[in-house]
Amino acid sequence: MGESIMANSTYVISATAQVNAPPRRVYDTIANYHTGHPRILPKQFQNLKVEHGGIGAGTVITFQVRMLGQTITFRAEVTEPDPGRVLVETNVKGSDSVTTFIVEPGDRPDSAMVTISTVFQRHPGVSGAIEKFVTERVIQPMYAEELRLLESVAASDEQGRA
């Protein structure tokens, strides 16, 4: 379901799942920060607010993540390097992590393969190794839940990008 790759001073946590909904609808659900994206967030993600835009590239959001007894506030800018297929959230507050959503056609016309992956900065030493170990075990289940919620939302309605 997911993987962790070590590369230099970063590591990646990702999860991939087949979503039983058309790729366009899946992508539009992810890209719509007004009505789609809020409905796919696991309970650890709270207070998602759109500061600017709200549909795909140019969107600026703030949100909080509660895990391990702490709440961290994030601010992220959204880009679409490959609109309709790749959406990227680059954190500019709270963390320097970058999360990428990739939507590809599934094995049927009405399905999509979706990957959520985040690149984290690795901190040096033992504390960095512990942080990576804990982060992997906390984030993996959150991404699995987000993919389950995405399937439920995208399969049940049509979000649209307008």
Per-region residue spans from a language model:
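Hydrophobic ligand-binding cavity/cleft-lining segments
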Residues: G2-H52
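Residue-level detector of alpha-helix boundaries and kinks
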Residues: Y11-V12, P22, F63, V88, ...
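Hydrophobic/aromatic beta-strand elements that line small-molecule binding cavities or substrate pockets
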Residues: A15-A17, F74-E80, V98-P105, T118
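Hydrophobic beta-strand positions in extracellular immunoglobulin-like domains
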Residues: V19, V65, T118-F120
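A short, structured loop/turn motif at beta-sheet edges
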Residues: N20-R24, I55, E80-G84, I102-M113
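Glycine-rich portal/gate segments that line the openings of hydrophobic small-molecule binding cavities
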Residues: L48-S95, S111, G125, E145-A162
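Beta-strand/loop substructures that line and gate deep hydrophobic ligand-binding cavities in soluble
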Residues: V88-E145, R161
